């Protein structure tokens, strides 16, 4: 029998200590990993609810288990809100992650061995866009496009050329490390020319799209997927969206359940519903606009301090710092900044001469610092501190000075007040 006063702290102190350590780390470190964000206590409340106890294979009003009358309401709320938020005609809120959402799209629309055309991981794409180590590059014949070496932007002429030569079943647009606005209509035209599906993975920019500060692909692509964390700031999970197409909707639903997943995570779906409602507020729209402003200030400050930024700037929430000319590895830069309580991630830059485990760049994003309430003043200040460390990554005195400055800034802008 359970009682409401049961706690992890009293039952499992080892686990509790690690959990509290992570909470403290989040409060005392500056988070600049582009794919990370802080979620609201409301989202966490939903994830810790009794909904975690309920099995609900199937879809609302079409379940394989009894007792689903309340989880049906929960899932339908999430579906309806996702459709309203993104202007979609169809939404599936069951994918456990962005990668699983992508896998379901491939299974719904492609057969093993079909050609897919996606952005190279080395140029800013995602593992699931055809990387050789991913299922997407093993089950399907993946052809990869990249960036124009002169501009650092997507080479649409190359995309069109590869599409004409390889006749892909599906063209994948989207990224995990790209700082410019993608021309969705250009991709649509290329896909139509060769008779391919257009699949957009907007996992990184979904919050920006929801707020109207980045163009929406939802009514342009055949299918769009996203995660519900990152810029959306919700729970860790996936989402599939599409414009009206009854045959396509049936294929997508089947690909999620029963083809690739069993029971949905109802507590996470409830948290997605909360997240979608939060994203409809004016406060959220203002937040997303500030995310972009902060990213631009940071990119501009790096350039002023003598650092190269891939494509020369940013139009979204992230950018890549190219450290090749500085003769610093991404791995060493990541480690030095970590000692100063600044969390970034090493990242390959286009045509990177170093291995993916070392790299020559850093990926930096602003969703988390903006969520804490930081604006352009703090963004510039932070960038100057980062550059101070990178200018001499062996200087522990500078690292410790910056760490103290970071701790003071974190106290001023707590993640969770009270």
Swiss-Prot record:
Q: Localized where? A: Cytoplasm
Q: Catalyzes what?
A: (6R)-5,10-methylene-5,6,7,8-tetrahydrofolate + glycine + H2O = (6S)-5,6,7,8-tetrahydrofolate + L-serine
Q: Where are the transmembrane segments?
A: none
Keyword Amino-acid biosynthesis attached? yes
Q: What is its EC number?
A: 2.1.2.1
Its cofactor is: pyridoxal 5'-phosphate
Task: List the keywords (alphabetical).
Answer: Amino-acid biosynthesis, Cytoplasm, One-carbon metabolism, Pyridoxal phosphate, Transferase
Keyword NADP appears in the UniProt entry = no
Q: Which GO terms describe its molecular function?
A: glycine hydroxymethyltransferase activity; pyridoxal phosphate binding
Instruction: Name the pathway it acts in.
Output: One-carbon metabolism; tetrahydrofolate interconversion; Amino-acid biosynthesis; glycine biosynthesis; glycine from L-serine: step 1/1
To which protein family does this belong? Belongs to the SHMT family.
NCBIfam families associated with the record: PRK00011.1 (NF000586)
Q: Which PANTHER family match?
A: SERINE HYDROXYMETHYLTRANSFERASE
Entries under HAMAP family matching the protein: SHMT
The protein's role, per its UniProt record: Catalyzes the reversible interconversion of serine and glycine with tetrahydrofolate (THF) serving as the one-carbon carrier. This reaction serves as the major source of one-carbon groups required for the biosynthesis of purines, thymidylate, methionine, and other important biomolecules. Also exhibits THF-independent aldolase activity toward beta-hydroxyamino acids, producing glycine and aldehydes, via a retro-aldol mechanism.
Protein name as it appears in the record: Serine hydroxymethyltransferase 2
């Amino acid at each position: 029998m359970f009682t409401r006063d049961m706690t992890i702290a009293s039952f499992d102190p080892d686990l509790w200590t690690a959990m509290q350590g992570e909470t403290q780390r989040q409060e005392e470190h500056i988070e600049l990993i582009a794919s990370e964000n802080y979620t609201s206590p409301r989202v966490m409340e939903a994830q810790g609810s009794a909904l975690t106890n309920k099995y609900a294979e199937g879809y609302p009003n079409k379940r394989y288990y009894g007792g689903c009358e309340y989880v049906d309401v929960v899932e339908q709320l999430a579906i309806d809100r996702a459709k309203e938020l993104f202007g979609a005609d169809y939404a599936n809120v069951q994918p456990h992650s962005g990668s699983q959402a992508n896998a379901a799209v491939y299974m719904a629309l492609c057969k093993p061995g079909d050609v897919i055309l996606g952005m190279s991981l080395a140029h800013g794409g995602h593992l699931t866009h055809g990387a050789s180590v991913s299922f997407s590059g093993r089950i399907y014949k993946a052809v990869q496009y990249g960036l124009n070496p002169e501009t650092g932007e997507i080479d649409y002429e190359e995309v069109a050329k590869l599409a004409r030569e390889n006749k892909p079943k599906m063209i994948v647009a989207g990224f995990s490390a790209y700082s410019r606005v993608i021309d969705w209509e250009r991709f649509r035209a290329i896909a139509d020319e060769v008779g391919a599906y257009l699949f957009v993975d907007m996992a990184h920019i979904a919050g920006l799209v929801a707020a109207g500060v980045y163009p929406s692909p939802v009514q342009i692509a055949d299918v769009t997927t996203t995660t519900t964390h990152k810029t959306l700031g919700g729970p860790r999970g996936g989402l599939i969206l599409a414009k009206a197409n009854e045959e396509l909707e049936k294929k997508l639903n089947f690909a999620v359940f029963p083809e690739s997943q069993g029971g949905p995570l109802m507590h996470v779906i409830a948290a997605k519903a909360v997240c979608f409602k939060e994203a409809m507020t004016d406060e959220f729209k203002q937040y997303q606009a500030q995310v972009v402003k902060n990213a631009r200030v940071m990119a501009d400050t790096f350039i002023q301090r003598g650092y190269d930024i891939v494509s020369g700037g940013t139009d979204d929430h992230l950018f890549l710092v190219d450290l090749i000319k500085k003769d610093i590895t991404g791995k060493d830069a990541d480690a030095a900044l970590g000692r100063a309580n600044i969390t970034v991630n090493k990242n390959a830059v286009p045509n990177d001469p170093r291995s993916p485990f070392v790299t020559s760049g850093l990926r930096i994003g602003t969703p988390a610092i903006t969520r804490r309430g930081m604006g352009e003043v703090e963004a510039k200040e932070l960038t100057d501190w980062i550059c101070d460390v990178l200018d001499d990554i062996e200087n522990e005195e500078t690292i410790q000075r910056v760490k103290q400055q970071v701790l003071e800034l974190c106290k001023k802008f707590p993640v969770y007040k009270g």
